[in-house]
Regions:
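Flexible, glycine/small-residue-enriched loop-and-beta-strand segment within the central core
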Residues: 1-9, 15-127, 152-157
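C-terminal substrate-recognition "lid" of short-chain dehydrogenase/reductases
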Residues: 125-127, 142-145
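Short helix N-cap motif at coil->helix boundaries in the Bergerat
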Residues: 141, 158
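Acidic, glycine-centered active-site loop in nucleotide-sugar glycosyltransferases
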Residues: 144-145, 150-153
Length: 158
């Protein structure tokens, strides 16, 4: 059984598992798969060809563009933006912002990024396109140059 809020919109080929909670004004594109036990809060937009595996929480105001994959246990905090073709490994987290309500996106993950499993991205950090983080990395600053980043805190590997 799922709980789906008001004004929910989905494209064709939308699939949803069991025991999900979807808030009001959520828009989901074509060929989207939402696994089991996901929580999607109000005013979230999800593009086409997106997979949310399961046990995922997406906070209000978040936008996920096309061709993204979020593995089990991913948590996206308020107003996060995932650009096209982002992969979030299992149990990755974007950490929350400030107490102030913002209308612009806080944490931004650029196109073609791969976030390794268990990684954390600090509040309101921005990753440019084509960034890879190793598993269990902690992103505590903006990343403005494409490359591979690892460690706590992250440092550029190459």
């Amino acid at each position: 059984m799922n709980e789906i809020g008001c004004n929910f919109q989905s494209g064709p080929d939308f699939e949803i598992g069991y025991f999900n909670v979807i808030g009001d004004n959520v828009k989901v594109g074509d060929s989207v798969l939402i696994g089991h036990h996901c929580i999607i809060e109000d005013d979230v937009t999800i593009g086409d060809n997106v997979t949310l595996q399961g046990n995922i929480k997406i906070a209000s105001g978040t936008a996920i563009e096309d061709d993204c994959v979020l593995k089990h246990g991913t948590i996206l905090t308020n107003n996060a933006l995932l650009k096209k073709n982002v992969f979030m490994g299992p149990n990755t987290i974007t950490l929350g912002g400030t107490h102030e309500r913002k209308t612009e996106h806080g944490t931004v993950i650029g196109a073609n990024c791969y976030i390794g499993g268990g990684s954390q991205i600090a509040a309101n950090k921005k990753l440019c396109d084509n960034v890879t983080t190793g598993a269990l990395s902690f992103v505590n600053r903006d990343i403005t140059e494409p490359g591979i980043y690892v460690g706590i805190p992250v440092r550029k590997l190459r």
